[in-house]
Amino acid sequence: MNVTRKPLSELRRPERNVRMHTDKQLKEFRRSIEMFGQIRPIVVDEDGVILAGNGLYETLLSMGRTEADCYVVTGLTEAQKKKLMLADNRVFDLGVDDLSALDAFVLELKDDLDIPGYEEDLLRAMVMEADEAADTLSEYGTIDEGRIEEIRDARERTEAREE
């Protein structure tokens, strides 16, 4: 991928953009850029028209930035450019969060939950719920898999005798 640095003044918004960016989203874009820098390039055609990354572009402008990392896509027809714009906005929406992975990350990061795109209070509540669940489980102790099998076998024998 050929990423190049371009002045924002050379980039142009597309005629239409299917994604509307809320103030909340732009605020979170800003927090992410402040925390990590620009981690994704803006995708533009050979004329500087933005094909993907309009929200990032808006955020960089509002931050007073004058340049951005850009990936220049060349040789696409107008129809292909429109398809790229639609696909970029839709494909991400088709995924779902792996809640167990999210829980694991949140527990690992529980001392610093300032994460762009997430409400810190919600993440703290998730940590508290996990801690409370662990406390509750510890009150009852643990049973190993062998003991669970013994209990199942005993129940099955009892049910068989009752038949």
Regions found by a protein language model. Give the residues of each.
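Aromatic/glycine/proline-enriched transmembrane-helix motif characteristic
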Residues: 1-163
